[in-house]
């Protein structure tokens, strides 16, 4: 990585599910042994698919080791998670026996880079400042132990090769175990997914499912009553969370399902009808299923909003409010609500007051900024020279995966074609791709079959792709927050990464924010950027939530004018809160964009 960084610095440029529906009178009964024929489908079709279409190998999330292979089914007097899943019987959790083939499919093998869990700088997380504010903040954990974590979850964490909790996990586990709501603000790549999955699953394994309402009719519409609901802004992030949930629900009574727009709803309905205890969903598709009467939220104990600020930016606020406030979801105070994101400006914190009760605000690290594990380089490149500059960069890079961001779908296609013609293994992902094409492209990139992924904003937030060593902003975004989240695709889980940006006079609207980001992360600020900053009008960085400063990571209850009385202790580790000096008005934002449609696919 150091060698690559030096080379950059010296560049001369300026539904195959076999687990059918189980009738109520047979639920919980031993089932006849059948061969599991839906192993992971790894058919590599080569690279002649051009722009990342159908030529790469299939990664069918509906088959393989997914729901049908090892999970599925409710059970009348008890609760079961399919043939190889555990059961909840007479108030006790009875895990299923271990299955070596299932473990290889779910957790991989230690040398497999696609199942990466930690990096060479993981111990550096011990030095990251953490601040937790609110009443009676629990002491953080320092290692994965039982208690407070459930024993089965600890076994699954070990199988996933997680050796120590990240800062957000150190606090989220005891906070949830103590029945508190949580707003967690943590840097990209800091383990937020485990931050909510670990405590939610641990408590679910201990307490079991809630009793379902009395049946009204033969099968009560085969309605699902999940214990936990996790909402995410995009189908890719939802699928990623689901993949992680499958690891940590292994051998347990909890059956995980995922639903999102852009794919046939019939397959998703069939999965839900077979039982759903933990539901990962995009807001639009979840609204659709609620309207169809296929899901009830009456038994929800845990509500998780991941990438909450992005969901609101995308116009999902009306849909989220409808789900949380207008349907049959367990009310505030009777459920636990967890909000996770890399940024939580004041207006989002104000909105959280409607969803959370007596919550703890957790700020981890340089929130709203970039990781110091990422080396950032900004190069001055005119538009007509970008392809040549890109080839120079790629020639200097030999290992790992490279993620290239462009602003338009047309440019994604054009640049991918150009790279393929230059004999690079490239694929693309953007909003005009079908869901299956996007999944195949991501699978090819994760596996290394394609070493270059050209992407629009569809892949900018939340996706955790191991071994991304280099992020290139071929086109800089107009918003500095988008820049932060783009480059956060590298340097994840303690690993080091390189981020390179092509800058020219057309990027004047991001000058001040970019300068501030580089300065905060102790990165070199090139002279042309300093000159551009001096001549740029105004003094505010261009952020869609501008006006509050970059590090909007403090509890608004501490801000001037907000009532902070009665919140009690504030536990701080290594540092104190930083932040702007004014939070602006406490008003509902009305400019979140169009919320129409439940397909959840039109925003790209």
UniProtKB/Swiss-Prot annotation:
Residues 173-362 form the Helicase ATP-binding domain. Residues 34-45, 584-604 have a biased composition (Low complexity). Residues 1-55, 67-94, 533-604 are annotated as: Disordered. The modification Dimethylated arginine is found at residues 62, 545. ATP binds at residues 186-193. A motif (Q motif) lies at residues 142-170. Keywords: Acetylation, ATP-binding, Cytoplasm, Helicase, Hydrolase, Initiation factor, Isopeptide bond, Methylation, Nucleotide-binding, Phosphoprotein, Protein biosynthesis, RNA-binding, Ubl conjugation. The keyword Hydrolase applies. The modification Phosphoserine is found at residues 215, 218, 263, 535, 539, 543, 572, 576, 598. Changing residue 162 to L: Reduces RNA-helicase activity about 5-fold in vitro. Its main location: cytoplasm. Residues 46-55, 67-76 have a biased composition (Gly residues). Changing residue 144 to A: Slow growth at 18 and 30 degrees Celsius and no growth at 16 degrees Celsius. It catalyses: ATP + H2O = ADP + phosphate + H(+). GO terms for biological process: positive regulation of formation of translation preinitiation complex; spliceosomal complex disassembly; translational initiation. A motif (DEAD box) lies at residues 306-309. The modification Omega-N-methylarginine is found at residues 51, 62, 545, 578. Residues 373-533 form the Helicase C-terminal domain. GO terms for molecular function: ATP binding; ATP hydrolysis activity; eukaryotic initiation factor 4G binding; G-quadruplex DNA binding; G-quadruplex RNA binding; mRNA binding; RNA helicase activity; RNA strand annealing activity. It is an enzyme of class 3 (hydrolase). There is a cross-link at residue 158 (Glycyl lysine isopeptide (Lys-Gly) (interchain with G-Cter in ubiquitin)). ATP-binding RNA helicase involved in translation initiation. Remodels RNA in response to ADP and ATP concentrations by facilitating disruption, but also formation of RNA duplexes. Has weak ATP-dependent affinity for dsRNA, but strong ATP-dependent affinity for ssRNA. Acts as a virus host factor involved in the replication of the MBV and the L-A viruses by promoting the negative-strand RNA synthesis. May be involved in recognition of the preinitiation complex and DNA binding of the RNA polymerase III and play a role in mRNA splicing. The Q motif is unique to and characteristic of the DEAD box family of RNA helicases and controls ATP binding and hydrolysis. Interacts with the L-A virus GAG protein and the whole L-A virus particles. PANTHER family: ATP-DEPENDENT RNA HELICASE DBP3. This is ATP-dependent RNA helicase DED1. It comes from Saccharomyces cerevisiae (strain ATCC 204508 / S288c).
């Amino acid at each position: 990585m150091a060698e690559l960084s030096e080379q950059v610095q010296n560049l001369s440029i300026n539904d195959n599910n076999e687990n059918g529906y189980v009738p109520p009178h047979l639920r919980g009964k031993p089932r006849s042994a059948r061969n599991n024929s839906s192993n992971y489908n790894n058919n590599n079709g080569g690279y002649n698919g051009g722009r990342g279409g159908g030529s790469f190998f299939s990664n069918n999330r509906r088959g393989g080791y997914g729901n049908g292979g090892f999970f599925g089914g409710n059970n009348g007097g008890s609760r079961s998670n399919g043939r190889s899943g555990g059961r909840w019987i007479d108030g006790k959790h009875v895990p299923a026996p271990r299955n070596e083939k299932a473990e290889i499919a779910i957790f991989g093998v230690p040398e497999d880079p696609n199942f990466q869990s930690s990096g060479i700088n993981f111990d550096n997380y011990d030095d990251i400042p953490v601040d937790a504010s609110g009443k009676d903040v629990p002491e953080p954990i320092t290692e994965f132990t039982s208690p407070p974590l459930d024993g089965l979850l600890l076994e699954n964490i070990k199988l996933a090769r997680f050796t120590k909790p990240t800062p957000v996990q150190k606090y989220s586990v005891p906070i949830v175990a103590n029945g508190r709501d949580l707003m967690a603000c943590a840097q990209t790549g800091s383990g937020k997914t485990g931050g909510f999955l670990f405590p939610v699953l641990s408590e679910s394994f201990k307490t079991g499912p809630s009793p379902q309402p009395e049946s009204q009719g033969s099968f009560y519409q085969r309605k699902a009553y999940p214990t936990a609901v996790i909402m995410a802004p995009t189908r890719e992030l939802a699928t990623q969370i689901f993949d992680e949930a499958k690891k940590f629900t292994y051998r347990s009574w909890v059956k995980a399902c995922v639903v999102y727009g852009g794919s046939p709803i019939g397959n998703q309905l069939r999965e839900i009808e077979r039982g759903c205890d933990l539901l990962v969903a995009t807001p639009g598709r979840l609204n659709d299923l609620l309207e169809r009467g296929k899901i009830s939220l009456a038994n929800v104990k845990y509500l998780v909003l991941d990438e909450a600020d992005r969901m609101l930016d995308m116009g999902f606020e009306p849909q989220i409010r409808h789900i949380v406030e207008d349907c049959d979801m367990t009310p505030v105070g009777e459920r636990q609500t967890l909000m996770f994101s890399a940024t939580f400006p004041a207006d989002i914190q104000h909105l959280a007051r409607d969803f959370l009760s007596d919550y703890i605000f957790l700020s981890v690290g340089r929130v709203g900024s970039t990781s110091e594990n990422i080396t950032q380089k900004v190069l001055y490149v005119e538009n007509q020279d970008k392809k040549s500059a890109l080839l120079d960069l790629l020639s200097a890079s030999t290992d790992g995966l490279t993620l290239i961001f462009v602003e338009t779908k047309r440019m994604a296609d054009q640049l991918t074609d150009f790279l393929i013609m230059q004999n690079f293994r490239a694929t693309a992902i953007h909003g005009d791709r079908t869901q299956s094409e996007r999944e195949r492209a991501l699978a090819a990139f994760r596996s290394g079959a394609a070493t270059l992924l050209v992407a629009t904003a569809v892949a900018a937030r939340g996706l955790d792709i191991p071994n991304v060593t280099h992020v290139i902003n071929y086109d800089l975004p107009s918003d500095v927050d988008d820049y932060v989240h783009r480059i956060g695709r590298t340097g994840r889980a303690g690993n080091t990464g390189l981020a390179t940006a092509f800058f020219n006079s057309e990027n004047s609207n991001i000058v001040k924010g970019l300068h501030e980001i580089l300065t905060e992360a102790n990165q070199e600020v090139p002279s042309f950027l300093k000159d551009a900053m001096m001549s740029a009008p105004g003094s505010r960085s261009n952020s869609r939530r501008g006006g509050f400063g970059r590090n909007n990571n403090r509890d608004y209850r501490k801000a001037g004018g907000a009532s902070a009385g009665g919140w009690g202790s504030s536990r701080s580790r290594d540092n104190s809160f930083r932040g702007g000096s004014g939070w602006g008005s406490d008003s509902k934002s009305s400019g979140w964009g169009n919320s129409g449609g439940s397909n959840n696919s039109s925003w790209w």
